């Protein structure tokens, strides 16, 4: 939350918004209010299970606060670089790497992150709230802005818990959902609730001024510049990319598993996981009893065994 009217953020309002999202973070919770800014976090522990990694998290002097959802796959290399530049770390979390990286490069922090993420970062010195979302929008981030306040959260229900926002359906958002299977950003299913688009940062100052920037877009090179690789080279390239993608996602301080449908995609992922780890891979599957046309559990069982 960020107030534009000179009033302090309401701790009770932030806490009420958090209560609607407790299913997302069962391990711990935290809340911080700093004048017009209020941040809440419900944590699902993945990296650094200690209290040192609790959120909202701040830097050394309390001038920056962040609530972050996701995983940063290159946080170890970022951490090493930042420590070499003199930044002290109090945790082993990827969250803290974002804070110190922001101290170094400001808004360009998102361009250095390899991962899936959505975060809100309060910069007290600049009196500004920064909302950011990963390149393809794997992690959600909804927000509402009016003349008095900015509200944001991982699900619309958090925003709708605030008494200043009425739950009204957006007809265009619903029409888009039934047309495409989702409501394209920045539209949502609710009126006056928007989505931070993938690959974007949106910031608001305490006077309500908005700045919006696209930091990444999917660009396809011309076919003439790429050429036509032979089948063996293409296969090797795809295998290398998939292996690296799976490998970077195996960094965790908790046991890992995979949803195994029995289809090609999940079977490849589980196969690569088994090659990259020494421990047996835990898999989970869902079947369709009595409907053999859609039931692939037999294939899932073959892969898991």
Describe the residue ranges of each PLM region:
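Cysteine-centered catalytic environments shared across enzyme families
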Residues: 1-305
């Amino acid at each position: 939350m960020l107030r534009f009217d000179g009033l302090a953020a309401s701790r009770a309002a932030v806490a009420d918004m958090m209560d609607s999202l407790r299913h997302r973070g069962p391990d711990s919770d935290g809340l911080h209010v700093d004048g017009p800014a209020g941040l809440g976090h419900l944590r699902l522990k993945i990296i650094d299970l200690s209290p040192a990694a609790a959120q909202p998290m701040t830097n050394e002097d309390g001038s920056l606060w962040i609530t972050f959802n996701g995983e940063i796959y290159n946080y170890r290399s970022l951490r090493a670089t930042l420590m070499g530049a003199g930044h002290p770390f109090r945790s082993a979390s990827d969250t803290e790497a974002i804070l110190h990286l922001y101290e170094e490069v400001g808004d360009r922090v998102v361009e250095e992150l390899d991962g899936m993420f959505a975060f809100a970062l309060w910069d007290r010195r600049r009196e500004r709230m920064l909302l950011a979302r990963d390149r393809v929008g794997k992690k959600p981030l909804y927000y509402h802005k009016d003349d008095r306040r900015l509200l944001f959260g991982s699900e619309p229900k958090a925003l709708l818990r605030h008494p200043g926002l009425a739950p009204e359906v957006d007809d265009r958002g619903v029409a888009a959902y039934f047309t495409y299977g989702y409501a394209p950003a920045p539209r949502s299913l609710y009126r006056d609730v928007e989505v931070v688009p993938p690959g974007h940062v949106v910031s608001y100052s305490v006077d309500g001024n908005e700045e919006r920037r696209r930091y990444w877009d999917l660009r396809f090179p011309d076919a003439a510049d790429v050429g036509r690789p032979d089948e063996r080279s293409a296969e090797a390239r795809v295998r290398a990319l998939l292996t690296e993608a799976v490998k970077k996602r195996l960094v965790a301080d908790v046991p890992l598993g995979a949803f195994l449908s029995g289809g090609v995609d999940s079977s490849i992922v589980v196969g690569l996981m088994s090659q990259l780890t020494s421990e047996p891979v835990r898999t989970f599957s869902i079947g369709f009893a009595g409907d053999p046309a859609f039931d692939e559990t037999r294939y899932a069982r073959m892969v898991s065994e």
